[in-house]
C-alpha cells in the first residue's frame, strides 16, 4: 500500500503547490504594474505597509517560543518527533503564507484606491480581487508543499501507515496554531487602531 501511494502521488502535491506559488507571484507582478498614485497616497500606503510588517514580525517573535515549546513537548510525548516535525513545518508554512498575504494586500490596497479614483470601480474591483486571491493561493500552495514534502519524507522513513497518518496530523496543528494566534492578535491590533484613531484626531 505504501509503494502504491508513493508511486502515484509522491511529487504531485509538491509540484502542484509550487505551481500555485508561481501563479501567486505572477498575480503580484501584475498588481505591481498598476500605478500607486499620488505621493500623498503612496506615503499613506507605505505607512500602512510598514505598520503591518512591524506588527507581524513582532507577533511572530512572540509566537516562535510558543511553537518551539509545542514542538519539544510533542517530541518528548508518545506522539514522537515525526509529529513534532510536522507541527514545525505546518507552523512555518502558515507563517510564510500569512506574511506573503499581508505584504501583497498592503501593496494592492493603495493601487485599488488609486484605480477607484482614476479608472472606476471595475478596475479597482479587479485589483482588490487579485490582491486578495494571492493569500488564498499561498495558503493552499504552502499546504500542498508542506504536506507533500512531509508525506514523501515519512513514506521513506516510516513503514507503518497509521504512524504516517498520525504524524501528518501535526501539520494541521502547527498551521492552525499560527493562524489562530495571528487572527486573534490581528483583531486586537485592529481594535486598538480604531480606539486610538479618535484620540489622535482630537489631539
Question: Positions of the model-derived regions?
Answer:
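Helix-interface capping motifs at the ends of transmembrane segments in multi-pass membrane proteins
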Residues: 2-6, 72-85, 145-170
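N-terminal alpha-helical transmembrane segments of multi-pass membrane transport
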Residues: 4-97, 101-105, 127-137
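Loop-to-helix entry region at the N-terminal start of transmembrane alpha-helices
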Residues: 12-13, 167-174
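Juxtamembrane helix-boundary/capping and inter-helix hinge elements in multi-pass membrane proteins
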Residues: 36-39, 114-123
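Residue-level signature of catalytic and energy-coupling elements of molecular machines
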Residues: 48, 112, 194
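Mid-bilayer segments of alpha-helical transmembrane spans in multi-pass integral membrane proteins
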Residues: 91-103, 136-144, 148, 175-184
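Inner-leaflet juxtamembrane helices
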Residues: 100-113, 186-190
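Single conserved hydrophobic/aromatic residue that forms the stacking wall/gate
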Residues: 193, 198-203
Amino acid at each position: 500500500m505504501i509503494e502504491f501511494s508513493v508511486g502515484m502521488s509522491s511529487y504531485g502535491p509538491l509540484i502542484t503547490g509550487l505551481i500555485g506559488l508561481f501563479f501567486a507571484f505572477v498575480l503580484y507582478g501584475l498588481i505591481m504594474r498598476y500605478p500607486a498614485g499620488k505621493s500623498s497616497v503612496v506615503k499613506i500606503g507605505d505607512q500602512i505597509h510598514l505598520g503591518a510588517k512591524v506588527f507581524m514580525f513582532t507577533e511572530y517573535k512572540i509566537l516562535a517560543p510558543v511553537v518551539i515549546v509545542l514542538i519539544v513537548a510533542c517530541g518528548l510525548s508518545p506522539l514522537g518527533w515525526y509529529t513534532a516535525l510536522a507541527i514545525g513545518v505546518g507552523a512555518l508554512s502558515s507563517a510564510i503564507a500569512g506574511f506573503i498575504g499581508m505584504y501583497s494586500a498592503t501593496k494592492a490596497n493603495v493601487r485599488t484606491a488609486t484605480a477607484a479614483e482614476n479608472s472606476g470601480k471595475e478596475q479597482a474591483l479587479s485589483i482588490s480581487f487579485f490582491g486578495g486571491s494571492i493569500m488564498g493561493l499561498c495558503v493552499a500552495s504552502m499546504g500542498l508543499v508542506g504536506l507533500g514534502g512531509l508525506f514523501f519524507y515519512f513514506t521513506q522513513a516510516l513503514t507503518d501507515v497509521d504512524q504516517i497518518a498520525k504524524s501528518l496530523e501535526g501539520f494541521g496543528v502547527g498551521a492552525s496554531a499560527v493562524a489562530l494566534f495571528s487572527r486573534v492578535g490581528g483583531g486586537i491590533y485592529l481594535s486598538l487602531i480604531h480606539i486610538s484613531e479618535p484620540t489622535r484626531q482630537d489631539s
